[in-house]
Amino acid sequence: MKINTAEFIISNSIVSLCPQEHLPEYAFIGRSNVGKSSLINMLTNHKSLAKTSGRPGKTQLINHFKINNNWFLVDLPGYGYAKVSKKTKEVFQQFITDYFEKREQLVCAFVLIDIRHEAQKIDLEFITYLGEIELPFCIVFTKADKISKGKVAQHVAAYRTALLKNNWEEMPHHFVTSATEHTGKESLLSYIDEVNQDIFKQNGF
């Protein structure tokens, strides 16, 4: 799939105020500084569609971007950010869970994980949460250019082992990406396109 247009539509923290159009939505979420904004900019061929920042927790709202006029890319706040107040964190967590549990247009969540690190408890807990609410999701490993291919394979295998220990029957669908080298761009966009085509056929688009 080629992305021809990417347009910012709205930022908000209330699910009922999200766009009313019945277009498929793909949510991107991960721990702070996982490289989410860089990945989104790489996928959409924009240098600053999503704002990049070295400060954790910079994204603090639900951000909708309309792609090719027929689907939405949704940029969500990171989880596990340390430099916001406890009350603020609770509010973020509430509207994130509201979005995941109430948003009918959401068809898939992409959970971003920094491939450089070992399996993190907070990532495993979030993946378990998505499984519990039966929301389709994929894992997107980021920053693959920062370590060797051998290390990448080792860390993916470690996540597989950790998930199997947490009662997953198999490793969820996953992608290995690098925003710097555009690694994984085509496979991720192809996946979104395949899901979109199925949805469009079902709805007679």
From Swiss-Prot:
Keywords: Cell cycle, Cell division, GTP-binding, Magnesium, Metal-binding, Nucleotide-binding, Septation. Pfam families: MMR_HSR1 (PF01926). Signal peptide: none annotated. Mg(2+) binds at residues 37, 59. Its cofactor is Mg(2+). Residues 22-198 form the EngB-type G domain. GO terms for molecular function: GTP binding; metal ion binding. GTP binds at residues 30-37, 57-61, 75-78, 142-145, 177-179. One of its GO terms (biological process) is division septum assembly. Necessary for normal cell division and for the maintenance of normal septation. Belongs to the TRAFAC class TrmE-Era-EngA-EngB-Septin-like GTPase superfamily. EngB GTPase family. This is Probable GTP-binding protein EngB.
